[in-house]
């Protein structure tokens, strides 16, 4: 990596992952993932924030989570057989996102299993942190 270029993350494994990704800037309020889409792309938030939403039976939007810089989304299809996406993901403001197709991810996993292990550790830490935040929020809501 060029010494004059600032890394996108403080985590070396993430920077290596990002070197394989397509990076794009996405405007505010843009739907990145639609429920019903094929699950075929993994995303990483370089900057900005997104909201993960579903629709209830009456068609009302329900926000499941807010994800921020340094978090992945769209990963469920990598680990579970899902024919389609089950939620929408929309940017809350302008975001810089890294994208990698599942086939490309699997190719890199075969070529660099160490990198994938490091990323899996980051993903597990991120999911654990999100779960802890959700647990705290649920407790506050039910006081």
Regions found by a protein language model. Name each.
Residues 50-62:
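A short beta-strand-loop-beta hairpin characteristic of the jelly-roll/cupin
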Residues 29, 40-53, 69-70:
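Glycine- and acidic-residue-biased ligand/ion/polar-headgroup-sensing regions
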């Amino acid at each position: 990596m060029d010494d004059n270029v600032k890394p996108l993350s403080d985590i070396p494994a993430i920077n290596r992952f990002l070197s394989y990704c397509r990076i794009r800037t996405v405007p505010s309020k843009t739907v990145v993932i639609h429920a019903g889409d094929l699950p075929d792309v993994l995303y990483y938030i370089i900057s900005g924030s997104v909201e993960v939403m579903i629709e209830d039976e009456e068609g009302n939007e329900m926000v499941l989570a807010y994800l921020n810089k340094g978090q992945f989304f769209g990963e469920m299809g990598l680990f579970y057989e899902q024919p389609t996406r089950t939620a929408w993901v929309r940017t809350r403001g302008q975001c810089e996102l890294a994208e990698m197709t599942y086939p490309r991810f699997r190719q890199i996993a075969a070529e660099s299993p160490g990198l994938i292990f490091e990323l899996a550790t980051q993903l597990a830490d991120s999911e654990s942190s999100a779960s802890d935040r959700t647990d705290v929020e649920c407790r506050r809501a039910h006081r």
